[in-house]
Amino acid sequence: MAVGIGIGLGRFPFETGRQYFDWVRYCEAAGIDSIWQTDRLVSKEPNLETLAAMAAIAGATSKIRFGMNVASIALRDPLITAKQCATIDRLSDGRLLPAFGIGSALSRDYL
């Protein structure tokens, strides 16, 4: 049995997009198994839109898996979200790890 290592990204701590992609490629080269992007549509801290980030990671890498650290399906059209996920998964050769939830009562973006 193997134990995988995943890294979660709750906000966008990088100064530039280039720094982000350098970090993503570093994670892949270092043998990290997966990158997880938190889904926050409203936040005081900078962060990326989850599905756009998944598509970007898919295009910048070839091995590492990636997923959303629970996308709020209550704020998204289910059919469009399913199609976006299917497209990203297909173009990444099955590396997308989708995760969905209804949101949190503790966060304004889920109201």
Where in this protein do the model-derived segments appear?
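Active-site nucleophile and cofactor-binding loops and adjacent substrate-binding regions
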Residues: K44, M68-R76
